[in-house]
Amino acid sequence: MKVVIVTSVRSLLDASIQFQKTACRHHCNYLSMQVVKEIEEFGTINEKNLEFDTWKDVIQNDEIDALVFYRVKQISISTGVLYESMMRNRTKPISMYFVRDCLAFDGNPPSFRMTSCNINAYNRSKIKDLIILMNMKTCNKKIIGEFIIDNFGSVDALLSIVNSNVTWVTSVINNSNGRGINIRVSNNKMLTITSFRRFVNKLKMYKTTKCASQLDNLCTEMNKMDIIDKK
């Protein structure tokens, strides 16, 4: 199957393009897809994008079997409407895959289906280690923050992995007592959802802490520049 990867950001401050590409490439490799092209967009995607030559070359090429997006929210219109617009210039059906959402869209009748999501062994191991660290009273925020950056690159990247593998992450959270030892947990669904949300909220706190630290560093550097200019 020949596919085209489509990544996009909404802000110049968003540095997630490379992570999106990596996630999509891993997904394609997992499903034995051949990536023949990668498209980068700024802003959300709609029918107007299809008017550009880059998109025309892809849409009118019946050798392309599918488009691989990072997530559904990249598209600002109905997925069905976008599909119909593409099919006006094609003789062969085209599929759309959404990596983060674990969804695929196959066209007419418009319908989504679940796809298998793969979390690699490295990420499994590091997420387990992270959960253990977060449950240890002797580990401070600095240590955990550095662990996240060293192993996942950013809090956003980690959150993307976690949100794409809710079931597996939740099972690890609920079966660990913080020392790497499995314990019996309740089958209460509400408790399971709460524990996952609590974990995600904790991760977001590290994102806020990191941003605040970066802002402090930036202000310090600007103050130094101001002092030099005055001299």
Swiss-Prot record:
Magnesium as a keyword?
no
The protein's matches in InterPro entries, at most eight in alphabetical order, are given as: Poxvirus_F16
| Major place of residence | host cell
Keyword field contains DNA repair: no
Report the subcellular localization.
Host nucleus, Host nucleolus
Q: Which keywords has UniProt assigned to this entry?
A: Early protein, Host nucleus
Q: What induces it?
A: Expressed in the early phase of the viral replicative cycle.
Question: In the UniProt record, which is one GO cellular component term?
Answer: host cell nucleolus
Please provide an example of a Pfam family that matches this protein in its UniProt record: Pox_F16
Name of the protein this chain belongs to: Protein OPG061
Protein family membership: Belongs to the orthopoxvirus OPG058 family.
Which positions make up the signal peptide? none
